[in-house]
Every structure is written in structure tokens, then in C-alpha cells.
Amino acid sequence: MKTYTAKPAEIEKKWILIDAEGVVLGRLASIVAMRLRGKHKPTFTPHMDMGDNVIIINADKVQMTGDKRDAKKYYWHTGHPGGIKHRTARQVLEGAHPERVVIKAVERMISRNKLGKQQMTNLRVYAGAEHPHEAQQPEVLDVKSMNAKNTRSA
């Protein structure tokens, strides 16, 4: 029997809505990365963009375990000598773009190549509860009820 390979016409993409309020960041990112790659589908083909379109709301209310909110640092370099910079997760979450914490966590769980970049375009993250994708009729994925460890209280 030959190995099944999906054809572009057979790929069916759904829209998934996830509420990140109170959900542990790493567990959320792992589930989202799996959905973006399409590994939850029985027709998964590694070299094709099979994943769903994922919308994450309330990204500013995501939780972290331990002291990661203060200890975890996001580094970047300005390109100038001695230009290494960093911000803690707390500074990013309280800043102008708190959704970047979730985007970066998911981005680091997706492969770093052309396919990975294509899959990341299917992710939309919003800091608040509002999103402009009602016309796509996304189905809600309740990450909190999947496992008791997926949530933390403040």
C-alpha cells in the first residue's frame, strides 16, 4: 500500500477560536502549533500547509507558571556593537503589544523554514476579547477543559 499524500484540492482549513484567558502559555502554544501544522488531522502531510486558521483572543491575560513572568527574558540585537537588549515577559505583557508573547511562543514551536512562515500567517492573535473574523464563523476550542493543568488562577 502506498503512503497517503494529500493533494492541494483535498486540504480543508477550518477557523478555530481560542480564548487564552487564564491558560498556561506553553500549553496553549503547543496546542496552537499542532493546529497550525495540521498534525491533528488523519490526512497530515509533512511538506504541505494542512493546518487550520487559528484566532487567539485575550492574549494579554495568558498565565505563566513559577516566576517566568519576571525571570523570562526576550532578547534582540540592534545590529550595533554592544547592542544586545532584553525585556522581561512582564514588561512585554504590560506594554503596547502584549500579544507578542503568545506569537513568539508559538513561532518557536513551528519549524523555521518557508513552510513554517506560511503556517504562521494562519495565526491571528488579539490582546482583547474583540476580533474581526466573525464572518469566518470560527468554532470555539476550549483549551481550559482539555486538561486541568492547562489553567492557572492569577
From Swiss-Prot:
Chain spans, region Disordered: 132-154
GO BP term (any one): translation
Disulfide bond residue pairs: none
One GO cellular component, as annotated: cytosolic large ribosomal subunit
Key word Metal-binding present: no
Gene Ontology MF terms: mRNA binding; structural constituent of ribosome
UniProt cross-references to SUPFAM superfamilies, sorted A to Z: Ribosomal protein L13
InterPro entries, sorted: Ribosomal_uL13, Ribosomal_uL13_bac-type, Ribosomal_uL13_sf
NCBIfam families named among the record's database cross-references: rplM_bact
Similarity comment text for this entry: Belongs to the universal ribosomal protein uL13 family.
HAMAP family xrefs: Ribosomal_uL13 (MF_01366)
Full protein name: Large ribosomal subunit protein uL13
